[in-house]
Amino acid sequence: MTAIVDIIGREILDSRGNPTVEVDVVLEDGSVGRAAVPSGASTGAHEAVELRDGDKARYLGKGVQKAVEAVNGELFDALGGMDAEQQVQIDQTMIELDGTPNKGRIGANAILGVSLAAAKAAAASYDMPLYRYVGGTSARTLPVPMMNIVNGGVHADNPIDFQEFMIMPVGAPTFADALRCGSEIFHTLKGELKKAGHNTNVGDEGGFAPNLPSADAALDFVMAAIGKAGYKAGDDVMLALDCAATEFFKDGAYVYGGENKTRSRSEQAKYLADLVARYPIVSIEDGMSEDDMDGWKELTDLIGSKCQLVGDDLFVTNVTRLADGIKNGRANSILIKVNQIGTLTETLAAVEMAHKAGYTAVMSHRSGETEDSTIADLAVATNCGQIKTGSLARADRTAKYNQLLRIEQELGAHAHYAGKAALKALR
């Protein structure tokens, strides 16, 4: 009944207008699972490989026909007839077939598309929502959203060196209320930026990209918008940063182009500690460069007890890198991006390892997204309590929020909004 009878890959467009892979997995009983694969702009050097064609005459070299051919040919040949319920076996078969440590031969974009589509097909066969199929009966926690409302770094054409300034509505009683809170602050911020003469166009992830000189200036605007929208910063709403520090780490130092300043490893740690002391910041992602291991340790020792320190480029959803971080006291949280590792099985293993070690986990989108809302279900399935999926604009971002609204409604009285309990610093 759940045997795989067809796997169909195709090239579609992501939210940046670049090609990406979409996969349909068809089962013997007629059930179909569909998954579209996201793509990142600021990518970690240790991520699984996204296979691109490299033909400059077609999509400027960004086509994914080779990955699609692998889906329709090699992967279907290997998986046809296999039971879609056997997720671990399916994923392991693809990993072994690829034969490289980073999925570089077949491509993580091909492998992930099949992996997620197979799980969705199996869920459909049982007439179960994906969050229930993957997470079982205990999957009922709606995550606190990290809403990226100001963009900088490689996500924007402005002087701000940090990539994302986010709000977290931790004081809301439900996910629906949290979403409303975020939306009201987002629109209030737009008005405040406009009033101050700033551009209010949105970036890749739906946040504003004003021409501000520093992180302090961006944080001040966000704080003002929270208050003007009728909420209390530090109680109803907390702040979060994604520094994406790898992007401005050069020759052993942190080079702030927008501020025309260079900070040493220790100065970087102290600067972030100072921001945490002056603003209600409860989470900092990639505050140090991906390979600055001493910097990560210094930052964790300095503020790890009072702030969530999320490893994105540091861990790349990889259990080997995560285990090393846990052992050596680097960071205290992991960002979970399905396409960084390339299979559902490995994604779930990373969340499990983090939770067992007392690390938090944050389910995350990429800057190049689609209308696929799988990560919303996975956030609930894993009870991770936090999701990072952009701003309150652009359909590729709101698709995930809308799916979480549906899940909360479906769970009814059993639904639980993570709120302040999602963050150890607020418990």
Curated annotation (Swiss-Prot):
Catalytic machinery residues: E205, K337
PROSITE patterns named in the record: ENOLASE
Entries under Gene3D superfamilies matching the protein: Enolase-like C-terminal domain, Enolase-like, N-terminal domain
UniProt entry keywords in alphabetical sequence: Cytoplasm, Glycolysis, Lyase, Magnesium, Metal-binding, Secreted
Protein name stated in the entry: Enolase
Metabolic or biological pathway, per its Swiss-Prot or TrEMBL entry: Carbohydrate degradation; glycolysis; pyruvate from D-glyceraldehyde 3-phosphate: step 4/5
Any one of the GO BP annotations: glycolytic process
Top enzyme class: lyase
Any single Gene Ontology cellular-component annotation: extracellular region
Classification of source organism: Bacteria, Pseudomonadati, Pseudomonadota, Alphaproteobacteria, Hyphomicrobiales
Family: Belongs to the enolase family.
Binding of (2R)-2-phosphoglycerate, residues: Q163, K337, R366, S367, K388
